[in-house]
């Protein structure tokens, strides 16, 4: 650690830890000072209140999901705290405005994955609104999640044909009007996978009927991913060694007749992967484990899969979760500072879609926090703590605005070298090329990354 980094980290110690502690020596998250963390969380939210109301459909859904998951963690940790209660009340009115925003759009003009982000957010909105006693708006968000978001993906993105090679079905990230068919990338498919699981669990918990179609689609999405993962020759799962893997941005197969040759929308780069996909896939697989018995019973009732074996099914899910967790730990966390990073690919950072992929680190931490202290058998406490610390220390001290960059140039290059040595792929270290990004969108997304990090941190206290 160089002098600059040491100064940065020890300065942060005075903010987030008891004054006598040295951040650079902290290995146990229990040494964090909860009241200091709570104050930082409140400050982070107050800034989010100022920047969240921007105009961008998918980013709006994702950033508010970050806010809701963060607020849920706050509530669980400090349910009676007056400042936390004030945060929850503010979110009530923000959800009213967000619902009006969603309804103002023509659904036919939106991309398929946009509805996945909003569908997941709507389920968390329902939970929040029921807790605050607003059943009317909670039911509107349930309808939004199921009848608008899930149905849109099913009708306009899912490939019902059996002809796609080498793997049939899956979802295309096209627009609902069909002007652009899009590509069957990971984010579109994992969003539909996770959303199907969560809608099924929601309806089952509330004893509602007519929920088998969500169970069926969750299983079909599992088959799509599992089929690809078994085709090891195509490298959809990046093998990092020691049973550690990361999932690529999209599955590709370059042969005559393949339906997976698309290298545009956005421009593909060999080995390219995104942090957000890793967190969502671990979450979807974990949700699948929670409904494994229901799936087995549904298959038996409907004779849906003659080769189904419940033990093999469960073991496969657990294997993928553990392998992905190991992959994140090995490939997406800097060895020198324990900070969670985006994989070093121009496709992530570049001007074409850097403003979209910017949010990935937060999305990964969001699901890390929800999955618990040892997701997939890996303890992520240290990296969540270090990342939240770095985000806090690099904020604007006047506005409490978080930055897209919260690591040093030197440590970024060390990480890029670490990644290339591990995989043989990737580019030199680079900064986020988001100069053309609307400023308020940038502020909102960056603040949501911080909320994701602090939400995960709260769950470690």
Show which residues each predicted segment covers.
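N-terminal export signals
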Residues: 5-23
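CBM-like carbohydrate-recognition segments
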Residues: 23-113, 117, 137, 155-168, ...
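The core hydrophobic/aromatic register in alpha-helical repeat solenoids, strongest
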Residues: 67-70, 121-125, 196-199, 285-288, ...
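Mobile, glycine-rich extracellular loop/lid and propeptide segments
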Residues: 109-122, 142, 148
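Inter-helical turn/loop segments and adjacent helix faces that build the functional surface
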Residues: 132-133, 199-212, 288-299
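Aromatic- and glycine-enriched pocket-lining scaffold segments that form the walls
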Residues: 142-143, 148-228
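Active-site cradle of extracellular carbohydrate-active enzymes
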Residues: 196, 211-288, 325
């Amino acid at each position: 650690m160089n002098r600059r980094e040491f100064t940065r980290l020890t300065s942060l110690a005075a903010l987030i830890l008891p004054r006598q502690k040295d951040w650079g020596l902290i290995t146990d998250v229990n040494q964090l000072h909860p009241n200091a963390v709570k104050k930082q969380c409140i400050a982070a939210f107050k800034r989010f209140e100022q920047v969240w109301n921007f105009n961008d459909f998918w980013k709006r859904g994702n950033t508010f999901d970050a806010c809701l998951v963060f607020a849920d963690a706050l509530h669980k940790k400090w349910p009676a705290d007056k400042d936390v209660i004030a945060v929850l009340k503010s979110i009530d009115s923000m959800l009213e405005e967000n619902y009006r925003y969603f309804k103002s759009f023509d659904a036919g003009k939106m991309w398929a994955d946009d509805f996945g982000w909003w569908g997941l957010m709507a389920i968390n909105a329902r939970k929040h609104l029921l807790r605050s006693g607003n059943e009317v708006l909670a039911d509107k968000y349930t309808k939004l999640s199921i009848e608008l978001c899930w149905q849109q993906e099913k009708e306009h993105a899912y490939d019902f044909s059996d002809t796609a090679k080498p793997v049939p079905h899956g979802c295309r990230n096209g627009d609902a009007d069909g002007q652009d068919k899009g590509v069957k990338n990971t984010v579109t498919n994992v969003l539909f996978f996770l959303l199907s699981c969560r809608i099924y669990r929601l309806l089952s918990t509330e004893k509602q009927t007519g929920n088998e179609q969500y169970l069926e689609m969750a299983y079909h999405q599992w088959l799509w991913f599992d089929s690809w993962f078994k085709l090891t020759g195509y490298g959809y799962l990046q093998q990092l060694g020691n049973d550690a893997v990361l999932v690529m941005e999209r599955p590709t197969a370059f042969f005559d007749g393949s339906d997976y040759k698309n290298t545009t929308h956005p421009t593909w780069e060999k080995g390219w992967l995104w942090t957000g996909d890793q967190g969502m896939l671990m979450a979807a697989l974990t949700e699948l484990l929670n409904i494994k018995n229901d799936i087995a019973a549904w298959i038996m009732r409907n004779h849906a899969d003659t080769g189904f074996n419940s033990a093999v099914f469960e073991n496969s899910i657990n294997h993928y979760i553990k392998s992905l967790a190991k992959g994140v730990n090995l490939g997406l966390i800097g060895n020198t500072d324990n900070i969670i990073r985006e994989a070093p690919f121009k496709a992530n950072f570049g001007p074409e879609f850097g403003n979209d992929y910017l949010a990935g680190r937060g999305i990964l931490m969001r699901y890390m926090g929800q999955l618990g202290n040892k997701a997939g058998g890996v303890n992520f406490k240290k990296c969540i703590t270090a990342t939240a610390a770095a985000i806090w220390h690099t904020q604007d001290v006047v506005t409490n605005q978080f930055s897209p960059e919260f690591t040093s140039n030197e440590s970024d290059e060390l990480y890029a070298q670490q990644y290339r040595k591990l995989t043989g792929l990737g580019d030199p270290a680079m900064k986020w090329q988001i100069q053309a990004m609307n400023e308020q969108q940038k502020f909102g997304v960056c603040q949501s990354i911080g909320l994701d990090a602090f939400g995960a941190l709260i769950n470690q206290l």
